[in-house]
């Protein structure tokens, strides 16, 4: 059987996990203009360097789904802040131009304008799912290979067993009568 070159199973596993952890850092500098929302694109140009998210205000917007939070941020939230039903929301929703602009979209939502900027928990979950899938594939391949090896063993039967590993020494025979064995195969009782 030829020897395998390169890394073994755990080495491939660790290497792929390391690459997955580095991918978000490598892709952070690449920004596709089609993925950035138009409001953010018009209000300020993209600056090179690390991007950070603004802190989330306390409230129900952090737990809402993405689509629901965006629709409420554009519609009823702006109306509530102008009516004065939520204190402090008017200063948060009004931008420098006096209208609900980028700050209401970016400040109240837990959504980054750049989809490649994922939260740490989402990255960890992605890595966990990929690693679990890799482990699952490894064990499935291992099981298939073991079955192929077992089929060959069944085909040849006794000839394929390792006789070197088997002990073929004769059993010790005691001539004493206080033996506790039920029967002796060499001298069956009649």
Curated annotation (Swiss-Prot):
Compositional bias (Acidic residues): 172-181
Keywords: Glycoprotein, Membrane, Signal, Transmembrane, Transmembrane helix
Region (Disordered): 37-119, 168-190
Localization: Membrane
High-level lineage: Eukaryota, Metazoa, Chordata, Craniata, Vertebrata
Species name: Rattus norvegicus
Principal subcellular localization: membrane
Transmembrane segments: 124-144
Extracellular side: 30-123
Keyword Manganese: no
Stated family: Belongs to the FAM174 family.
Official protein name in the record: Membrane protein FAM174A
Topological relation to the membrane, as annotated: Single-pass type I membrane protein
Glycosylation sites: 27, 83
Signal peptide (residue range): 1-29
Cytoplasmic topological segments: 145-190
Listed PANTHER family: EXPRESSED PROTEIN, MEMBRANE PROTEIN FAM174A
GO CC term, one of those recorded: membrane
